[in-house]
Amino acid sequence: MRIADYSVTRAILERHGFTFKKSFGQNFLTDTNILQKIVDTAEIDKKVNVIEIGPGIGALTEFLAESAAEVMAFEIDDRLVPILADTLRDFDNVTVVNQDILKVNLAQYIAEFKNPDLPIKVVANLPYYITTPILMHLIESGIPFSEFVVMMQREVADRISAQPNTKAYGSLSIAVQYYMTAKVAFIVPRKVFVPAPNVDSAILKMVRRERPAVEVQDEKFFFKVSKASFVHRRKTLWNNLTSYFGKSEETKGKLTAALERAELSPSVRGEALSLEEFACLADALKSEGL
């Protein structure tokens, strides 16, 4: 019997008198086939350390611990810590950290792995309400995670992995794909969770690039420009850029020169631009002193 078997999950919750907190976005997976598929997608073996976020009662953790060298699971809900101590008691390669992943010194914890030099993968069922902040925090942390295999709301997974000229493509696609390749591995129906969420989920596989997808003069500025270009999706690049940088004649002159330098039409929409075109645009705007 597995932790994720529906009857076992129910028994664990009842035994510990656990009630779900909406504020933590708790939805526990009760399908062992999907859990195995997640581990297979992440290609976990004894030469890999794993960071898990939001282990819940340990359904995914159990599968990860069987395959990985070590698992470090960050759980914000202190009510779940004694439950995890119970459900994972047979594993000596799991550390549960009762902390908010957004607030810890992650490098310090990673140094505590028995073999901290092994590749580190992030495998998690992320809370819907805070998926993007967690992902960006980890991606931008400077810690060289080799791979992320994470479950999230299907719509968010589609946005992250989207390509130009699609409805889902936006600043989030650019922010992630600058650092990682991103691909939806498979869809997870809502009915396999307790409690069932209102939407389906997706498993997103992201692999870190050896170097960023494009070269830019100023990374922060590149992300600001891409974000500004999607503020009003139906508006042209020109309208979004003038809204962000200003509408004085001097600014308009600089914007015109930058667009010409980047070989972009003012009437194009942000969703049509590739990462390479955004890089050219950001560098051109920077060169114009904007």
UniProtKB/Swiss-Prot annotation:
Disulphide bridges, residue numbers: none
Signal peptide: none
InterPro entries for the chain: KsgA/Erm, rRNA_Ade_diMease-like_C, rRNA_Ade_Mease_Trfase_CS, rRNA_Ade_methylase_Trfase_N, rRNA_adenine_dimethylase, SAM-dependent_MTases_sf
Primary location: cytoplasm
MF terms (GO), sorted A to Z: 16S rRNA (adenine(1518)-N(6)/adenine(1519)-N(6))-dimethyltransferase activity; RNA binding
Catalyzed chemical reaction(s): adenosine(1518)/adenosine(1519) in 16S rRNA + 4 S-adenosyl-L-methionine = N(6)-dimethyladenosine(1518)/N(6)-dimethyladenosine(1519) in 16S rRNA + 4 S-adenosyl-L-homocysteine + 4 H(+)
Location of this chain's protein in the cell: Cytoplasm
Entries under Gene3D superfamilies matching the protein: Ribosomal RNA adenine dimethylase-like, domain 2, Vaccinia Virus protein VP39
Alphabetized Pfam families for the sequence: RrnaAD
Gene Ontology CC terms, in alphabetical order: cytosol
Physiological role: Specifically dimethylates two adjacent adenosines (A1518 and A1519) in the loop of a conserved hairpin near the 3'-end of 16S rRNA in the 30S particle. May play a critical role in biogenesis of 30S subunits.
Similarity field: Belongs to the class I-like SAM-binding methyltransferase superfamily. rRNA adenine N(6)-methyltransferase family. RsmA subfamily.
Annotated protein name in UniProt: Ribosomal RNA small subunit methyltransferase A
